[in-house]
């Protein structure tokens, strides 16, 4: 008989957390590259309600804005305010909506 490895749910949480942290590291060290955006997207897919969801979405919005992708940043701002109306990045999201 073969043993079946059972992966505890925490392991998956750690993997998604790592995706967020890698995005943040890339964002802070390289000024918001597409690589950072891909890590944030991966985190948001894997853990849409995770501990870092608000920060990942907010950082994605700010990175897009810094990159001049204002239409995309505005879409993320609307999503951010719907999900996290009093979140850390709400103050940055509101002007992006007004600029639509």
PLM regions: where:
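Specific register positions within alpha-helical solenoid repeats of the TPR/Sel1-like families, i.e.
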Residues: 20-27, 64-65, 98-99
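Hydrophobic/aromatic packing residues within the alpha-helices of TPR/SEL1-like helical repeat arrays
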Residues: 1-2, 40, 77
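Repeat-based scaffolding regions
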Residues: 17-20, 31, 54-55, 59
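TPR-repeat structural position
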Residues: 32-33, 70
């Amino acid at each position: 008989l073969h043993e079946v490895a059972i992966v505890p749910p925490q392991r998956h949480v750690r993997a998604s957390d790592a995706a967020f942290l890698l995005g943040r590291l890339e964002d802070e060290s390289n000024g918001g590259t597409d690589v950072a955006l891909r890590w944030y997207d991966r985190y948001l897919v894997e853990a849409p309600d995770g501990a870092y969801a608000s920060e990942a979405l907010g950082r994605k919005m700010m990175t897009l804005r810094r990159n001049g992708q204002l239409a995309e940043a505005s879409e993320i701002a609307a999503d951010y305010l719907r999900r996290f109306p009093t979140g850390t990045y709400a103050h940055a999201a509101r002007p992006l909506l007004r600029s639509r």
